[in-house]
Regions:
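Acidic catalytic loop of the alpha/beta-hydrolase fold
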Residues: 207-211
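Short alpha-helix in the alpha/beta-hydrolase fold that links the catalytic acid
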Residues: 198, 212-221
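Conserved hydrolase catalytic core segment
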Residues: 98-137
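Conserved HGGG/HGGXW glycine-rich cap/lid loop of the alpha/beta-hydrolase fold
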Residues: 18-70
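Catalytic histidine neighborhood in serine/cysteine hydrolases
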Residues: 221-238
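Active-site loop/oxyanion-hole signature of alpha/beta-hydrolase fold enzymes
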Residues: 59-99
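Short beta-strand/loop motif that positions the catalytic acidic residue
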Residues: 196, 202-204
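Catalytic histidine-centered segment of alpha/beta-hydrolase-like enzymes
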Residues: 235-244, 248
Length: 260
């Protein structure tokens, strides 16, 4: 397992490879973290998946997260579009990745949808989406408001500091500030769904505190037959951490069935 950094237009992004990319033509699973995530917060799920599939994986922390360069706050409300349509393609170029499966969680899953539907990048062969959002719901805002209170009054800041270091404030406020902005209520990425014509696996916890099953229905309807949806009972917003075995089995079978 190698830790490293890549420079993109003067900004340093933390990356970590699990497994070795021997040939450029080999497929890579690219992990895109949630709104408060980073390389370290994927825990051991990527390594466990690698042991099962033997497909190299790339984890990276977006700017303002983990050990990456800091970012300015407040973020522009199209921050996920910029990540999807500008930063992610640049990262794949810089690392000479020719075939990839995007594995996104929450904001990372939404970024994956925008990237795939907006660019139809031939390098992307499949999407694994955990708890994606395509529009804003009351439950999302309510849970983020609770997180804001915990960050300001509780110990959430201290917990996140262990993973985001000096980025802890720009990581939190970049995320919460955007999602709680009144103008963000209009955020909607359903227009990108019709442009997705590769296989998609969508996994959501039945008890997800950040989104309802309306997200799943919208994505399934928007993408159509290329999308397979799985709802995991007794699970909230992080299936890979809360129900790792069930999630691993679903992901393993899906990726084994892809044509690279």
């Amino acid at each position: 397992m190698k830790k490293n950094f890549v420079n993109l237009k003067g900004n340093k992004l933390e990356i970590r490879w699990i497994g070795e990319l021997v040939k450029k033509s080999e497929p890579v699973i690219v992990f895109l973290h949630e709104g408060l995530g980073c390389v370290d917060l994927w825990r051991d799920f990527p390594a466990t998946l690698y042991k099962t599939l033997k497909i190299p994986s790339l984890l990276y922390s977006r700017q303002g997260y983990g050990r990456s360069s800091p970012s300015k706050v407040p973020k522009s409300l199209d921050f996920m579009h910029k990540e999807a349509l500008e930063i992610l393609p640049r990262l794949l170029d810089a690392l000479e990745i020719e075939r990839a499966v995007l594995f996104g969680h929450s904001d990372g899953a939404s970024i994956s949808l925008i990237n795939c539907g907006g660019l139809q990048d031939k390098r992307i062969k499949g999407l694994v989406l955990l708890a994606p959002h395509v529009f804003v719901e009351d439950i999302s805002i309510s849970s983020i408001q609770k997180a804001k209170l915990e960050f300001e009054k509780g110990n959430l800041r201290e917990k996140l500091m262990k993973y985001h270091f000096s980025n802890v404030d720009c990581a939190f406020w970049g995320w919460a500030g955007a999602w709680l902005d009144e103008d963000f209520l209009k955020w909607n990425i359903e227009e990108y769904l019709a442009g997705i014509n590769i296989p998609v696996l969508l996994i959501q916890g039945e008890d997800d505190q950040y989104g309802t099953l309306a997200q799943v229905t919208a994505i399934q309807n928007g993408i159509g037959i290329n999308c397979t949806s799985e709802i995991i009972s007794g699970c909230a917003h992080s299936p890979h951490l809360e129900k790792p075995e069930a999630t691993l089995n679903l992901v393993k079978e899906f990726i084994k069935g892809l044509k690279f």
